Amino acid sequence: MIMHLGLMMVVGLTLCLMHGQALLQVPEHPFSVVWNVPSARCKAHFGVHLPLDALGIVANHGQHFHGQNISIFYKNQFGLYPYFGPRGTAHNGGIPQAVSLDHHLARAAHQILHSLGSSFAGLAVLDWEEWYPLWAGNWGPHRQVYLAASWVWTQQMFPGLDPQEQLHKAHTSFEQAARALMEYTLQLGRTLRPSGLWGFYRYPACGNGWHKMASNYTGHCHAAITTRNTQLRWLWAASSALFPSIYLPPRLPLAYRQAFVRHRLEEAFRVALLEHSHPLPVLAYSRLTHRSSGRFLSLDDLMQTIGVSAALGTAGVVLWGDLSFSSSEEKCWRLHDYLVGTLGPYVINVTKAAMACSHQRCHGHGRCARKDPGQMEAFLHLQPDDSLGAWNSFRCHCYSGWAGPTCLEPKP
């Protein structure tokens, strides 16, 4: 079994380097908005139809959470991801060093083969948030438990080492095991479903959160975190897409929201090129509601999330929500009214504008992005009369196989 999986991984990595960016780079879709909300119950249980297709939003068949366009795998639903529960219970050994990599990969392979169709070409998102693969990134009480458990594990496994050597061994063994779990899982997914876009949710991180700071908030990513992102070259090499989070922090002032989103996306664009000759596609995760109040995002909020993502040149935005959105007929109607009245019209506007700019400036062989990322007023929007803009503030990011200022030059 071990040799078989190892061979599959090598073959899969070769396949994925050939096929890595097939999905959201077709000329017809320079920017996509993807639905990652389990809303199937609205139609099935309450008779409320959510017209996602008519609004230009990409969804799975039947609006199911897992399907041909997007599937997200949580910590307790995929392989043998090790973590500690809220009461300190160790699941799958608790720490990466304590889980069998071979058993994890065997179980993950079974789940991939049975949950994703053989022609799957959607987004495959792994949501593993309990620990960070670099030792120094596990700060705060929630994550420090993994450092403490690693030290205990090392003391049990290597009792002959002195305390300083045990601490060093805990550090290195944690990082080696964490890397193996994440790297081999991505390679396995890309082997078995090579047309899918595989990556981890919330990677890369940025560390530019809002903590009631003074008026000098810039939105820049924390220097220590950008350094760690550079150290994670192996993760970007194994990924075929990046899924950073642009969830707006509670009470983040409107004046700072664009800077918050922009710098998170710019960091993703930076790491997208670290291990690839052509950048990985970036699809930012956004929410439908504010975390603190539960209010739906306003039109201004949508501009600072979806609008900024399109203007900076991402491949798309993934809209996330949980089962609460479809938990009752009333909530389904609220979601319907928000879709039809606010979200849907804005998505139609942005996706049409992105397509028009792609064809007018980039000959349909690339997507438009701001010439100056900090030009806050430059958006891919249709005019109020639905006419096209001049797009003078945008340049082209060419798709793989094309080059030049307007993506007109074939590139082998």
From Swiss-Prot:
<dbReference type="InterPro" id="IPR013785">
    <property type="entry name" value="Aldolase_TIM"/>
</dbReference>
<dbReference type="GO" id="GO:0071347">
    <property type="term" value="P:cellular response to interleukin-1"/>
</dbReference>
<keyword id="KW-0967">Endosome</keyword>
<dbReference type="GO" id="GO:2000368">
    <property type="term" value="P:positive regulation of acrosomal vesicle exocytosis"/>
</dbReference>
<keyword id="KW-0245">EGF-like domain</keyword>
<feature type="domain" description="EGF-like">
    <location>
        <begin position="353"/>
        <end position="408"/>
    </location>
</feature>
<dbReference type="GO" id="GO:0007341">
    <property type="term" value="P:penetration of zona pellucida"/>
</dbReference>
<feature type="glycosylation site" description="N-linked (GlcNAc...) asparagine">
    <location>
        <position position="69"/>
    </location>
</feature>
<comment type="similarity">
    <text>Belongs to the glycosyl hydrolase 56 family.</text>
</comment>
<dbReference type="GO" id="GO:0030214">
    <property type="term" value="P:hyaluronan catabolic process"/>
</dbReference>
<feature type="disulfide bond">
    <location>
        <begin position="362"/>
        <end position="396"/>
    </location>
</feature>
<dbReference type="GO" id="GO:0033906">
    <property type="term" value="F:hyaluronoglucuronidase activity"/>
</dbReference>
<keyword id="KW-0472">Membrane</keyword>
<keyword id="KW-0130">Cell adhesion</keyword>
<dbReference type="GO" id="GO:0051216">
    <property type="term" value="P:cartilage development"/>
</dbReference>
<dbReference type="GO" id="GO:0071493">
    <property type="term" value="P:cellular response to UV-B"/>
</dbReference>
<feature type="signal peptide">
    <location>
        <begin position="1"/>
        <end position="22"/>
    </location>
</feature>
<dbReference type="GO" id="GO:0009615">
    <property type="term" value="P:response to virus"/>
</dbReference>
<feature type="glycosylation site" description="N-linked (GlcNAc...) asparagine">
    <location>
        <position position="216"/>
    </location>
</feature>
<dbReference type="GO" id="GO:2000355">
    <property type="term" value="P:negative regulation of ovarian follicle development"/>
</dbReference>
<dbReference type="InterPro" id="IPR013111">
    <property type="entry name" value="EGF_extracell"/>
</dbReference>
<keyword id="KW-0968">Cytoplasmic vesicle</keyword>
<dbReference type="GO" id="GO:0001669">
    <property type="term" value="C:acrosomal vesicle"/>
</dbReference>
<keyword id="KW-1015">Disulfide bond</keyword>
<dbReference type="GO" id="GO:0046677">
    <property type="term" value="P:response to antibiotic"/>
</dbReference>
<dbReference type="Pfam" id="PF01630">
    <property type="entry name" value="Glyco_hydro_56"/>
</dbReference>
<keyword id="KW-0256">Endoplasmic reticulum</keyword>
<feature type="disulfide bond">
    <location>
        <begin position="398"/>
        <end position="407"/>
    </location>
</feature>
<dbReference type="GO" id="GO:0031410">
    <property type="term" value="C:cytoplasmic vesicle"/>
</dbReference>
<dbReference type="GO" id="GO:0005783">
    <property type="term" value="C:endoplasmic reticulum"/>
</dbReference>
<dbReference type="Pfam" id="PF07974">
    <property type="entry name" value="EGF_2"/>
</dbReference>
<dbReference type="GO" id="GO:0007155">
    <property type="term" value="P:cell adhesion"/>
</dbReference>
<dbReference type="GO" id="GO:0006954">
    <property type="term" value="P:inflammatory response"/>
</dbReference>
<dbReference type="GO" id="GO:0005764">
    <property type="term" value="C:lysosome"/>
</dbReference>
<comment type="function">
    <text>Facilitates sperm penetration into the layer of cumulus cells surrounding the egg by digesting hyaluronic acid. Involved in induction of the acrosome reaction in the sperm. Involved in follicular atresia, the breakdown of immature ovarian follicles that are not selected to ovulate. Induces ovarian granulosa cell apoptosis, possibly via apoptotic signaling pathway involving CASP8 and CASP3 activation, and poly(ADP-ribose) polymerase (PARP) cleavage. Has no hyaluronidase activity in embryonic fibroblasts in vitro. Has no hyaluronidase activity in granulosa cells in vitro.</text>
</comment>
<keyword id="KW-0325">Glycoprotein</keyword>
<dbReference type="InterPro" id="IPR027260">
    <property type="entry name" value="Hyaluronidase-3"/>
</dbReference>
<dbReference type="GO" id="GO:0005769">
    <property type="term" value="C:early endosome"/>
</dbReference>
<feature type="active site" description="Proton donor">
    <location>
        <position position="129"/>
    </location>
</feature>
<keyword id="KW-0326">Glycosidase</keyword>
<dbReference type="GO" id="GO:0004415">
    <property type="term" value="F:hyalurononglucosaminidase activity"/>
</dbReference>
<dbReference type="GO" id="GO:0005576">
    <property type="term" value="C:extracellular region"/>
</dbReference>
